Amino acid sequence: MSTICPPPSPAVAKTEIALSGESPLLAATFAYWDNILGPRVRHIWAPKTDQVLLSDGEITFLANHTLNGEILRNAESGAIDVKFFVLSEKGVIIVSLIFDGNWNGDRSTYGLSIILPQTELSFYLPLHRVCVDRLTHIIRKGRIWMHKERQENVQKIVLEGTERMEDQGQSIIPMLTGEVIPVMELLASMKSHSVPEDIDIADTVLNDDDIGDSCHEGFLLNAISSHLQTCGCSVVVGSSAEKVNKIVRTLCLFLTPAERKCSRLCEAESSFKYESGLFVQGLLKDATGSFVLPFRQVMYAPYPTTHIDVDVNTVKQMPPCHEHIYNQRRYMRSELTAFWRATSEEDMAQDTIIYTDESFTPDLNIFQDVLHRDTLVKAFLDQVFHLKPGLSLRSTFLAQFLLILHRKALTLIKYIEDDTQKGKKPFKSLRNLKIDLDLTAEGDLNIIMALAEKIKPGLHSFIFGRPFYTSVQERDVLMTF
């Protein structure tokens, strides 16, 4: 790492985090704009290592760089700007989220950033969306925290007359620490256990001599079908790391290379935590043979998820995209409302409770059986196991199958665009679409719609959203009688 001259500034508070394995992250920082001194760093989080790659002064210099030029920032209220810096001369990349907030009695500009070596650029890019989503929600909670702390400190000043304004907002740091550590742990686990970009089909179930050698035929069909219906997002749990990882690799065959790099294998010694935003992840059960998925993280996943248990051969799935996004937004709003109404730091720090209010009570039974059968995956499995294993034939046949799915998804998108004049008119008939595109099987339609959703986000809500919202409103009205 090249030498950087740190600015003459007072020492910045720092928290060192003990992580298992190698951490690709150099540091995370929380900075703010001081109207007199310019950009200043409030806190640094860094992995605890024997070798210091960046000094505190260097980290401070880099973090200050993210707020340079933000003095004239004129963003909408509540806006969060994502900045991506590649500083080749310094050998680092910086991902910074810039936002406005109230602290020390004044409205100012803040930056929450993570710093990585430039050599980790290819590793980080597939995980960029995951990290930005995490940091964005941290900022949502941080804004509420800062505002509440400011109100409390102002009350202390009025009542006691002894508090100083400079101390306001200090307790936001413990809250940020509790939120930043999981992001650092996620990146460390992905560094050591991410799924490789190229998967050898010999390490998957598709290399078996016959269907059913490694797992039951119906289980494999349901697992792959539901995996595709939930936009390629699945969590695989079990007691054997080898068995779990074999299913993880099998499901990752149906993902793009970039999506595979955003998937994680199971750790043999101990189980990782569930992480929202990953496409496929393997998790070990505990000594009692159970595994509990955290409700909050599952709800915050960008796509619905398939739950696969390799011990008992069960496959469950969440509701489709439009329903998942609807529930996710209501839950997020409910959580932030509860955070705002909290009367103590213990309540504000509580992250495991299920938030409810008068208008929304989340359904804890979010996983359901695979209700809709398909013909696409069934035909693929029937044919692929007729090919001789151990050769490249099955890999080629899989590539052809994925190409067909992609073409069908593009055709569906064009069909909807032409029928609605690119969204200017409401969609007329789902029945005609299913007949014209040969998607009469409900499972086939779900698979192609899920793939089309990734190509053109929002398509699910455009087609299914209005009748779903209407049914929800009708249900709410009926429940009032």
Curated annotation (Swiss-Prot):
InterPro entries from the UniProt entry: C9orf72 (IPR027819)
Source domain of life: Eukaryota
Sequence segments annotated as region (Required for the homodimerization of the C9orf72-SMCR8 complex): 461-481
GO CC annotation terms, alphabetical: Atg1/ULK1 kinase complex; autophagosome; axonal growth cone; cytoplasm; cytoplasmic stress granule; cytosol; dendrite; endosome
The entry's keywords: Autophagy, Cell projection, Cytoplasm, Cytoplasmic vesicle, Endosome, Guanine-nucleotide releasing factor, Lysosome, Nucleus, Secreted, Synapse
Main localisation: nucleus
Subunit-structure text: Component of the C9orf72-SMCR8 complex, at least composed of C9orf72, SMCR8 and WDR41. The complex is formed of two protomers, each individually consisting of one molecule each of C9orf72, SMCR8 and WDR41. The protomers homodimerize via an interaction between C9orf72 (via C-terminus) and SMCR8 (via N-terminus). Within each protomer SMCR8 (via DENN domain) acts as a bridging protein between WDR41 (via C-terminus and N-terminus) and C9orf72 (via C-terminus). The C9orf72-SMCR8 complex associates with the ULK1/ATG1 kinase complex.
PANTHER family xref list: GUANINE NUCLEOTIDE EXCHANGE C9ORF72, GUANINE NUCLEOTIDE EXCHANGE FACTOR C9ORF72
Name used for this protein in its record: Guanine nucleotide exchange factor C9orf72 homolog
Organism listed in the record: Mus musculus
Organism ancestry: Eukaryota, Metazoa, Chordata, Craniata, Vertebrata
Gene that produces this protein: C9orf72
